[in-house]
Amino acid sequence: GCALNSLANNQILINNYFEKIFIPYAPGDAGGSIGSALITFRKKNKDSFANLTTPFIGSAYSNEDIEKIINNDQRLKQFKIKYYKNRLELNNLIAKKIYNNNVVGFFNSRMEFGARALGNRSILANPCSPNIKEIINKKIKRRESFRPFAPSILFEEKNNWFRNSHYNPYMSC
């Protein structure tokens, strides 16, 4: 779990203590299960090597699975299902919804494994809305008010928002 200290990881990175640094997508205690599985795999399969190159190793659901869940839950029947093959059209719709202070649940492909939501299972909302934190914490997540939120910005815009910004795909430093 020591690699989950993102503040320490960031200091290691920006102070150039090492030529290269890699912090995995599951740097906390949960990552130990991945390490154990890889060691066991390696012991049993001496001629091959398992390499997990993506954090998106969690469960996945088909469109039919999702429709069934929504149609069988009274609380979810109010939601309409619409499929988008054009990603730009979907992105524009999401941007408009967020701009109009709607909260958007984003569900895409496989679930990420690790301490951070990396985009495949996300709650998206307008950060300019003064009461959005309370809405998400109380009404949607039903959690304590002190829980943190993470901003999402385009990679190309990172230097406009952060000092010492760097490529950090797993938000671990």
Which residues does each PLM region occupy?
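Glycine-rich phosphate-binding loops at beta-strand->alpha-helix junctions
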Residues: G1-Q11
